[in-house]
UniProtKB/Swiss-Prot annotation:
Belongs to the T7likevirus protein 7.3 family. The lineage of its organism: Viruses, Duplodnaviria, Heunggongvirae, Uroviricota, Caudoviricetes. This is Protein 7.3. InterPro entries: Phage_T7-like_viron_assmbl. Pfam families: VirionAssem_T7 (PF11653). Its main location: virion. One of its GO terms (biological process) is viral tail assembly. It comes from Escherichia phage T7 (Bacteriophage T7). Keywords: Viral release from host cell, Viral tail assembly, Viral tail protein, Virion. It comes from the Viruses.
Length: 99
C-alpha cells in the first residue's frame, strides 16, 4: 500500500508543479517587457521618494484616572475565584491526572 500512496502523491505534486510553472511564465514575460520599456536593462531603476514631514501629535496634559478592575475589591475577589475554578477538573471531563 505504501508504494501506491507514494505514486499517487508524486502524480499530484508533479501536476501542481506544472501548473505553477505555467502560471509563472506570463509573469516573467510581463516583467521583462516592463523592464524593456523602462530603459532596456534588466535591472530596476531606483527612484528617490521624498521623506514626508513628521506629524505633530497633541498630548493631553490632564491625566485620566480610570479604576482598573484588579485595583478594586470586587476585581480582586473575581480574580481569586477565577483562579480557583481554573484549577479544578469537572467530573464529566474524564481527563483526570494519573501520577
Amino acid at each position: 500500500m505504501g508504494k501506491k500512496v507514494k505514486k499517487a502523491v508524486k502524480k499530484v505534486t508533479k501536476s501542481v508543479k506544472k501548473v505553477v510553472k505555467e502560471g509563472a511564465r506570463p509573469v516573467k514575460q510581463v516583467a521583462g517587457g516592463l523592464a524593456g520599456l523602462a530603459g532596456g536593462t534588466g535591472e530596476a531603476q531606483m527612484v528617490e521618494v521624498p521623506q514626508a514631514a513628521a506629524q505633530i501629535v497633541d498630548v493631553p496634559e490632564k491625566e485620566v484616572s480610570t479604576e482598573d478592575e484588579a485595583q478594586t475589591e470586587s476585581g480582586r475577589k473575581k480574580a481569586r475565584a477565577g483562579g480557583k475554578k481554573s484549577l479544578s477538573v469537572a467530573r464529566s471531563s474524564g481527563g483526570g491526572i494519573n501520577i
